[in-house]
Amino acid sequence: MTVIKPSHFVVVPTAMWGHLRPLLHLSLNLLTLHPNLHLTLLVTPSVLPRVEHELKSTSFAHIYTKSPSGSGTSTPNPNVHHTTAQEQAQEDKAIADRLQVITCISPEFDMPKEWSPEVIAQEGMDYAKTLPKFLQALASKEHKLDGTENKFEDIAPNFVVYDSFLHFVPEVVRGVLTGLQKPMIPLIAFIPSNAAATWHTFAKEENGGTFTLAQRLIDEDIANGMDVLEAHGKHAFGTYGKVKTIPGLPPKFDYEWWPNFATVPMPPQAFMGIIPSAKAIRDPAVSGIVCPTTAETEPLAVEALEKEMGFRIYMAGPQFPDAAWAGEHPEPQAQNADDANVFAFLDKMKKKHGAKSVIYVSLGSLFFPVTRPELIRYILQSLKESGFPFIFAYASQMASLPEDLQKELNDDEDSCVVKFAPQWDVVNHEATGYFLSHCGSNSTAEAMLAELPMVSMPFAADQGEFTAMLSEVYKVSIDLKQVKTFKSPDFNKLYDGTVVVGTEEAIKAELKQTWDTLRGPEGEAMRARMRDLKAVIKKSWADGRSKKDMLALGTCFE
């Protein structure tokens, strides 16, 4: 006889939507898969509206239905014993009843009318300062969390899932539980990336890790009298012209892994905030890492990461609701004027040019070639000149579009330019056939599920690793080479022998060749290969490593 006891996990996310969204989806999928789990999500005010909007989306309608269908269904089982009336009623609850979203911020924080990067940075510091108070209240099973009712006051947290960039979390949790004279609970670090990039970031220096190398060089420069900010700015994603081989990927010069980082201004303070995560992730309290990617697509990298870290790596797979995996796409609902423009444009393009005729261009919610905005002009003008209908979304706070280019595109009926686009709806529309992307983890996963051939324009972080996998291992993407902009002008040759000329003429010639390839036989071959890749990740989600690790993650505290 199995005894089912309610359990409770706390999620501590960063305010970056590209990190928070897959972590939110992971959390909801865990609730769906494990009927005994309860979730407390501690968020900042700046991202609360987006979280609430995501929870209300049609993709997650099932979480509000009692006894939901799908993998979260909990049917009566005579071999299961419920120890309390509360547990007996558990099976009749909706998934949303086992979720609480709590805003974690101090009363002293001055809520702004608009969220600037500076205010968000202040919010992050306040969150770190306030987090211990909220964790203590949860661990003590208090009825109120700074005025908000604690729905799960009878269930103390069993484990914590936290964004790996919030390096202070292990020490905070340890301090709270030690003060309460309670035993330490498992901590799981969430990294919204693949195994290859995680290994590249967090491996020891002697094995090829970048953060540990940067930390040593920073410490040496500071010891020799260099200013702290200057040292961090100097070595942030530093490259030295050396060949770097990442498990499962082809060799490249180190600067090729962050191929457009030089176009994105990064304050030294930003790197100062994340580099300690390389040390924190090896804290004894951290018992595992969860990556929302598929182990079967990069077995060598997964093996290397497991060997490097020495603890459990949960390769949980891309995080989508069951309806998305089943290929169900509800009729999209416009939430604003941009959405309405996008949907009308796609419907029009399908009638005019046919199915799979539109290319969607988006570089994510964070990245944009700020120091080389002409790259965007070249791309969009090249598409226009080639008669290739497109949607361009520029969601980054760093992004802006010159007025003359905006006017030029507004006058073109085959162009649609918006600040924000409902990406999941766009990539799954019948008119959409291709995706030009920075190849972040979320965009890559959505392109795979939508079976879209890709064009890659990576900047930094894990985008180079995703691009190498997509373009060179699986050949489902074309990597743009002439747009690459490295930190040092001396670095202009790729490991494969390509010389980056980088002129308007060279860039536009490569772009034209790319558009011709996409719309020719090779483009359809790429689509077929992407379909095969999708089959691999779907099988893993259904009954492979992803399913196995999702099941294990929900019981990691046992």
Task: Tell me what each language-model feature is.
Residues M1-I281, G288-C291, L300-V302, E306, ...:
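Glycosyltransferase specificity loop/lid
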Residues T294:
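Hydrophobic pocket-lining residues within nucleotide cofactor-binding pockets
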Residues A316:
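Active-site cores of enzymes that catalyze phosphoryl transfer or operate on phosphate-rich substrates
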